[in-house]
Amino acid sequence: MFSSPDSPILHCLPRVAIIGAGRVGSTLAQRIAEKNLADVVLLDIVEGIPQGLALDLLEARGIELHNRQIIGTNNYADTSGSQIVVITAGFPRKPGMSRDDLLRTNAKIVIEAAKQAIAYSPYAIFIVVTNPLDVMTYLAWEATGLPRNRIMGMAGVLDSARFETFIALELGVLPADVKAMVLGSHGDLMVPLSRYATVNGIPITQLLDAVTIERLVERTRNGGAEIVELMQTGGAFFAPASATSLMVESILLNQSRLLPVSIYLQGEYDLKDVVIGVPCRLGLNGIESVIELNLSDSEREALHISAKSVQKNIERWRSLQNS
């Protein structure tokens, strides 16, 4: 079902290329290096920015007690031989904007980045972070021609972390004790699975009333917008970088973590030809398997509504191309 690339680079020192040296990209570079996961190549089109950030991170190595190599560059040739390519390049949201409003501007950026990166790292696994996430992942999949296990979007890990955070704040408990999962698109139609959320194994339905749970679900759906409205000058970057580094870690260390990941579906959940967030097992080959949960009728309906919104934006992009 899933391909296993016969790649010589899997036997080399691990290297992660990050395309886009903005706040998410640069914070992700820091996370990966300081967790001692891999060497990092940070690429951006603006001269001096990735080089300066790389030097800054290099100067912190002695303090952070690691010896990872960090390169800043404007040349895709320097990303050659990367095991993982993370695409964060693109314009961030501004107050009042939805993730879908970024479609026209960011699609061209992501497609070009994907084509350039795959030319130098043909065996790499790709993680897309740029918004609108699900559509950008679909376009990157088309641009690279990769098997679906080697290209994925980071959304569900972040959305699940937000849901867990709001549950923990409501109950006054340790966030690490809260486990939750959010499926669907990375937007207003995401599907937080309340009945699967637990605190140390106790379902939150036994700890919180239905009205409170629905309030936390709605806050989760608007979690990104809440930060954009507060900051006024951009969106979240600490939590997105942490969520992406968790995916990188699971792949490089072959941890087989079960995480919600945006993937091209081929019939799972009765959905086809769409990228959307579902539970997946992440390991050395990227997405090792897709897990099909036993969803209720209302959960399945919500997932399908979410998928239709992604398909609508894919068609919107195609119409823009033809206009």
Swiss-Prot record:
Gene3D superfamilies per UniProt: Lactate dehydrogenase/glycoside hydrolase, family 4, C-terminal, NAD(P)-binding Rossmann-like Domain
> Alphabetically, which GO biological process terms does the record hold?
lactate metabolic process; tricarboxylic acid cycle
- InterPro entries annotated for this entry? L-lactate/malate_DH, Lactate/malate_DH_C, Lactate/malate_DH_N, Lactate_DH/Glyco_Ohase_4_C, Malate_DH_type3, NAD(P)-bd_dom_sf
Enzyme type, top EC level: oxidoreductase
Is the Oxidoreductase keyword given for this protein? yes
Recorded catalytic reaction(s): these are: (S)-malate + NAD(+) = oxaloacetate + NADH + H(+)
- What are its E.C. numbers? 1.1.1.37
The superkingdom listed in its UniProt entry is Bacteria
Q: Name one GO molecular function term.
A: L-lactate dehydrogenase activity
Question: Which amino acid positions bind substrate, per UniProt?
Answer: R93, R99, N131, R162
Q: Where does NAD(+) bind?
A: G20, A21, G22, R23, V24, G25, D44, N106, V129, T130, N131
Q: Active site: which residues?
A: H186 (proton acceptor)
Under Pfam families, the record lists:
Ldh_1_C, Ldh_1_N
Per UniProt, the keywords (alphabetical) are: NAD, Oxidoreductase, Tricarboxylic acid cycle
Q: Which family does it belong to?
A: Belongs to the LDH/MDH superfamily. MDH type 3 family.
Q: What is this protein called?
A: Malate dehydrogenase
**Species of origin:** Nostoc sp. (strain PCC 7120 / SAG 25.82 / UTEX 2576)
